[in-house]
């Protein structure tokens, strides 16, 4: 499996733990096709330490699996530590590629040894959220724009956490993000500043290729300003 389609309804389920996308991706990318999944192995594959807080981390994973079972997967427990599962159907989603998932998990493990905080669960959630909103129509730029407050309200993450996740995704060259400052339309009406997201790379048949993100962002800015002027009669 080269990528995971994360259900949009799961991404927006802000009542659930922020680790929901991490565990969903880990479940599919590390255990898909196996008859039985081990909670211990899943916990480890998510990047959680099993040395000092094994029982706490595993209990949290079990709880999130239980939450996922409400709407997104069906589970059958063999015993308290192993289960089999099937994915429930869905229509809308955000894609996370295996190479992106592995790069984020590798960075989390490396920075943990350096005692630097790196919230990989929120980073995956923000990435899945942005991807779920990107316009896939060929005639439109494949971008998404929103305020940090909007993303916070829809994911359940704090603005500070989202801002940190965005910085990491930029540093890793997964997303390119530009801020469109407050602007005044032709009717002298001010519009709120937004962040514009574009993919740093595109994927085709498993191969990663550079994306024309600068052009995509410029087209998006023009579309935003054009729409604002039309709505005010400018």
Give short role names for the model-derived ranges.
Residues 1-234:
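Electropositive, intrinsically flexible nucleic-acid-contacting patches
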């Amino acid at each position: 499996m080269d990528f995971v389609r994360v259900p949009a309804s799961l991404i927006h389920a802000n009542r659930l733990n922020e680790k929901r996308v991490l565990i969903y991706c880990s479940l599919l990318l590390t255990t898909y096709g196996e008859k039985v999944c081990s909670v211990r192995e899943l916990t480890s594959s998510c990047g959680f330490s099993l040395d000092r807080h094994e029982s706490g981390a595993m209990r949290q994973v079990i709880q999130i699996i239980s939450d996922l079972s409400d709407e997104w997967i069906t589970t059958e427990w063999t015993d308290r530590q192993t289960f089999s599962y099937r994915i429930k159907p869905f229509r809308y989603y955000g894609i996370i590629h295996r190479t992106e998932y592995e790069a984020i998990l590798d960075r989390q493990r490396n920075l943990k040894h350096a005692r630097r905080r790196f919230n990989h669960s929120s980073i995956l959630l923000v990435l899945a959220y942005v991807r779920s909103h990107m316009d896939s129509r060929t005639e439109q730029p494949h971008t998404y724009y929103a305020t940090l407050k909007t993303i916070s309200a829809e994911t359940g993450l704090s603005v500070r956490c989202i801002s940190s996740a965005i910085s990491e995704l930029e540093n890793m060259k997964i997303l390119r993000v530009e801020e469109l400052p407050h602007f005044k339309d032709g009717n002298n009406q001010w519009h709120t500043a937004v962040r514009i997201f574009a993919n740093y790379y595109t994927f085709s048949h498993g191969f990663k290729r550079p994306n024309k993100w600068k052009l995509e962002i410029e087209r998006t800015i023009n579309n935003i300003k054009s729409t604002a002027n039309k709505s005010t009669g400018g």
